[in-house]
Amino acid sequence: MRELSLHILDILQNSVEAGATRVELSVVEDLAADRLTIEVRDNGRGIAADKLPYVFDPFYTSRKTRHVGLGLPLLQAAAECCDGDATITSEIGVGTTLTATFQHSHLDRAPLGDMVGTLMSFILGGACDLRYVHRVTGRLEDGKLENWGDGADDTEARQFDCDTAEIRAELGNIPLTHPEVRAWLRQFITEGEATLTQT
């Protein structure tokens, strides 16, 4: 896939298919450590221990109908090509956590891509609540790592946080798919993502 956001959308959809009612997506760009970490945690049915060794096998599926899932093997291959890895932990009845790591500056690492489109697509699908956290630690200025100090504690991070459960609570009976809410949500996510790259 040309963008990591497409891998993320695929993993989010896997969570929905596993019966999740809440998914937590974390994207951490640690520029000082030259690391990009993507983590998706859900409260779905989980994966049986005897099936876990096969989740990254492109020739294995537990499905009896529909397509064979290549999303996880492709994500793992993308991570490994960038000096990273992909791992899954899961517990029946509790949920599943997928973690993928990449060398942030690796030449072969696909760009994060259209996170706004990915998030809007998933959120407006309405299948479950999503908490999204995107954190960038440090920044590169002319090829050198610079700090983002706020003068108080010299924090070197920026973070955008979006939780649809909190938004739904504020909206009451108004659905996220309402045209005005949808427009606000797109603007909120777009502006939140933009704050992570501002100098």
Annotate each PLM feature.
Residues 42:
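Acidic ATP/Mg2+-coordinating residue in the GHKL
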Residues 1-28, 78:
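Conserved ATP-binding N-box helix of the HATPase_c
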Residues 104-199:
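N-terminal assembly/transducer modules of large multi-domain enzymes
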Residues 94-96:
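Glycine-rich GHKL/ HATPase_c ATP-binding element in histidine kinases
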Residues 28-38:
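Short beta-strand-loop-beta element adjacent to the nucleotide/active-site pocket used for signaling
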Residues 74-84:
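Conserved glycine-/histidine-rich ATP-lid loop and adjacent helix of the Bergerat-fold HATPase_c
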Residues 88-92:
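A short beta-strand-to-loop motif within the catalytic HATPase_c
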Residues 47-58:
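Short conserved segment of the HATPase_c
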